[in-house]
Amino acid sequence: MPSSTAMAVGALSSSLLVTCCLMVALCSPSIPLEKLAQAPEQPGQEKREHASRDGPGRVNELGRPARDEGGSGRDWKSKSGRGLAGREPWSKLKQAWVSQGGGAKAGDLQVRPRGDTPQAEALAAAAQDAIGPELAPTPEPPEEYVYPDYRGKGCVDESGFVYAIGEKFAPGPSACPCLCTEEGPLCAQPECPRLHPRCIHVDTSQCCPQCKERKNYCEFRGKTYQTLEEFVVSPCERCRCEANGEVLCTVSACPQTECVDPVYEPDQCCPICKNGPNCFAETAVIPAGREVKTDECTICHCTYEEGTWRIERQAMCTRHECRQM
């Protein structure tokens, strides 16, 4: 009887304690969810700590009497059942807290791993900023490829291809062929053909330069003329655009005039003698074909030979004795 009474009293006190906790929780809905989540874990954590300190031997000793005594085992099961029944209100309390507005924090607790709090993230960011760009590792520049030294063994062109000694090769796309020797490439410049004088575009990508475009016109005094075109610059001057791009001009050959006072007319190349053939008698101009008395004692005339007037600028003059009055 005394043991039954004690058990009844214990059960009643446990029920009263659970009822009081529920009333306090319902009256105060602002209890942090973290404390509610940590509350059921504390007994288990203390048990694990005791178990780790006591060791597996102590746990076996505690479990053996419970298996040996059937009645005690049943009491333990009944007590554990009552403990589970007491935990049911805690789960209902969590659901009520989530429905009252604590869902966001509860979600944070489920997503965020233990120890990864906003304070820890802020400290990590501050530590990263404190390092600064000075201590940050800088990438090393890539090493340039260095061709090995093939002197005495071969020759290398611009692309890195190796040629054996005695082989002919072109060091580059615009280089002339070379002979690979033990001393290095031996290159001889061949005799290249001369470029056209009218070439205006030269290709130098090969060993010998080549003309890709020639000029087919001439420029003379601000005007453009086609190849082999003839043109007149003045009445006496004719020009021609040659194949080499140069302009050659010739002046018309005018016959020698039969006078000493020729006149140039517009649009005519050669001068003409408007006053006919004549010549100079000292400073005076006398007509040809007759004798002209320049003074009382001097007679002059222009020379005439073989039917043409001989070009003599000065007349032939003879002086006679004359009486003085």
Swiss-Prot record:
Annotated Pfam families: VWC2L_1st (PF23333), VWC2L_2nd (PF23334), VWC2L_C (PF23331)
InterPro entries named in the record: VWC2/VWC2L, VWF_dom
Chain positions covered by the region annotation Disordered: 37-121
Database matches in SMART domains: VWC
Short sequence motif named Mediates cell adhesion, residue ranges: 114-116
Leader sequence segment: 1-27
Protein's UniProt keywords contain Signal: yes
Domain VWFC: 153-212, 216-274
GO biological process: negative regulation of BMP signaling pathway; neurotransmitter receptor localization to postsynaptic specialization membrane; positive regulation of cell-substrate adhesion; positive regulation of neuron differentiation
Basic and acidic residues biased stretches: 44-56, 64-78
This protein's record includes keyword Signal: yes
Key words, A-Z: Basement membrane, Extracellular matrix, Repeat, Secreted, Signal, Synapse
Main location: secreted
GO cellular component: AMPA glutamate receptor complex; basement membrane; extracellular space; extrinsic component of postsynaptic membrane; glutamatergic synapse; interstitial matrix
Subcellular location: Secreted, Extracellular space, Extracellular matrix, Basement membrane; Synapse
Subunit-structure text: Peripherally associated with AMPAR complex. AMPAR complex consists of an inner core made of 4 pore-forming GluA/GRIA proteins (GRIA1, GRIA2, GRIA3 and GRIA4) and 4 major auxiliary subunits arranged in a twofold symmetry. One of the two pairs of distinct binding sites is occupied either by CNIH2, CNIH3 or CACNG2, CACNG3. The other harbors CACNG2, CACNG3, CACNG4, CACNG8 or GSG1L. This inner core of AMPAR complex is complemented by outer core constituents binding directly to the GluA/GRIA proteins at sites distinct from the interaction sites of the inner core constituents.
Protein task: BMP antagonist which may play a role in neural development. Promotes cell adhesion.
Entry protein name: Brorin
Origin species: Homo sapiens
Gene assigned in the entry: VWC2
